[in-house]
Swiss-Prot record:
PROSITE patterns in the record: DFDF, FFD, SM, TFG
Segments forming domain Sm: 25-108
Region Disordered: start-end pairs: 1-27, 102-141, 159-187, 258-305
Keywords annotated in UniProt: Cytoplasm, mRNA processing, Repressor, Translation regulation
Lineage of producing organism: Eukaryota, Viridiplantae, Streptophyta, Embryophyta, Tracheophyta
Protein name: Decapping 5-like protein
Function in brief: As a component of the decapping complex, involved in the degradation of mRNAs. Promotes P-body formation. Translational repressor.
Taxonomic source organism: Arabidopsis thaliana
Family per record: Belongs to the LSM14 family.
Biased composition, class Polar residues, residue ranges: 104-138, 167-187, 293-305
GO biological process, one term: mRNA processing
Self-association state and partner proteins as the record states: Homodimer. Component of the decapping complex.
CDD domains in the cross-refs: LSm14_N
InterPro entries tied to this protein: DFDF (IPR025762), FDF_dom (IPR019050), FFD_box (IPR025761), Lsm14-like_N (IPR025609), LSM_dom_sf (IPR010920), Sm (IPR047575), TFG_box (IPR025768)
Compartment(s): Cytoplasm, P-body
Amino acid sequence: MASESSQSSSPSSSQPPSSVPSPSPGNNVGDTFIGSFISLISKYEIRYEGILYHLNVQDSTLGLKNVRSCGTEGRKKDGPQIPPCDKVYDYILFRGSDIKDLQVNPSPSAQSRQEIQSEQDVNQSPHSRPAMTMSSPISGYDSGYGLGRGSQWINTPALSSKPVPVTQHSSVPLSFQPPSANAGSLTESPVSLIDSTQSNAGSSMPIPSFVQGNKFASSGVPLGMMQKPVSSSSTIPNGPQIIDYFSSPIMGLVDDSSQVVTRSPDVSSNQSYSSNPSPLGQTQLHTPPGLASVSSNLSPPSEAQLSAPNIQKIYPSAPQAIGKVVYDPQSNHPHRSIPHELPAVASNSAPVIPGPLSKSPESFFDMDPSLQSRQQMVYRGQEMFAATNPASANVPSQSFAPRNHAPLLPLPVSAHQSRIPSSSIEYTEEFDFEAMNEKFKKSELWGYLGRNNQRNQNDYGEETAIEPNAEGKPAYNKDDFFDTISCNQLDRVARSGQQHNQFPEHMRQVPEAFGNNFQRPPPLQPGQGAYLAAQTNYRGGYHNNNNNNYYSNSGYGYYSGGRGRGRNTHF
């Protein structure tokens, strides 16, 4: 049988099953608590959790099984805290004297456990549902890509061979791929499907980007290129977008190959699209929205001039600069995808735009192939972006400037450099200290300060030395100064009754040493307060009249001997 140890405050190891106390008999009062979850705190502030299986009221003992120690949990005031233990004990028998606090929590029933398990399954169901395939017709399913008519896309190999997982929070199939090689087997055109989807789902529904023709059938376009939604804003109307996937070095401007670069159609914002699909072998003229005013003044080319074979004959391998719209790959919401105009290079099937945007093939690849690095391509992309800007549409075309060209305007001068004069003084020789010492008139300086004899020149140019003052005051006399004011002789004289005869002499010595303002009266006998008040300015106002060569003092004095008021003159 195991019990809690008073020294280590930890339960002992489990004993053999033979010594385990049997459950309480049926007539015991505590049978109703058998099987309850017990949380008790021992007298050593350690909390234990377990299931009650034995309770004896007569012996004041209880037994727990599957017991786990939770430690002191900060309740212990003296000594170190005991951390919780992960070990689960088979059983522990507690005495009533070892228990400080006890709480009974009824054990959950089997029905409540099933309800908790079912709630957990419901919460995890969106992440664990099996994947659904598009090989069977689905009624009422709309993924946002115009697949509301699932029966019309059943025969498409690109959709029937790819499983599409469907979750609760996402309405877009993750492995959607538009048809490439077998595009002719579609029962309905993609444009009509988009129009029908938009009429049902609204203008905020994302639109897939389809590929005209089968020129990407053998190129192996990555799947991530076909999953980017197109923003449906007022500046870019909803309609079929054509993907330009090319291998020009200028693609270094776009991070990774997962970016989708699309061209906006050549129509103004107040025009509408027609739902008729365009032929697969025909290419249309596309212009950025910012150049609508420029392209409106130009005569539209004929279909024969815009056909792919004619363009390939004129420029078999020269890409053209066309304004692109790159959408944010991190945003899957149509309202969060903000278009950014970025220069790019169209493929061979892109048309030639007349005007300032049309460049000769030699202007792009006029340098040595070894010099066409990534940085040079970025620099050329910036020049092409400036060419596609509407503000610079009327500027005549110019050849690209070299990378290391001089600035057109002088660089601004900082405030620190503007205070520095332009003509700097250059010192070619060292500083001559001896010559500077000769120029320095040390005698005049020291004579002015009184530390040397000042030499003056008379009217005839002769120098005369001024003799020092012979009537200078001598040094102090020790007997007359320090000994008179620093000893206690005056106190002894006052106590012996001789102070009245020596007081006038003392009053003459004190003003000579400290002046009249620093006089301090000596200790007096009783009855001499009036005399001291008449002779000193202690606590009195001072008045001096230099014209009459006299000064007068007046004041009040309060001493132990009496009170007096007087007025005196210089003596």
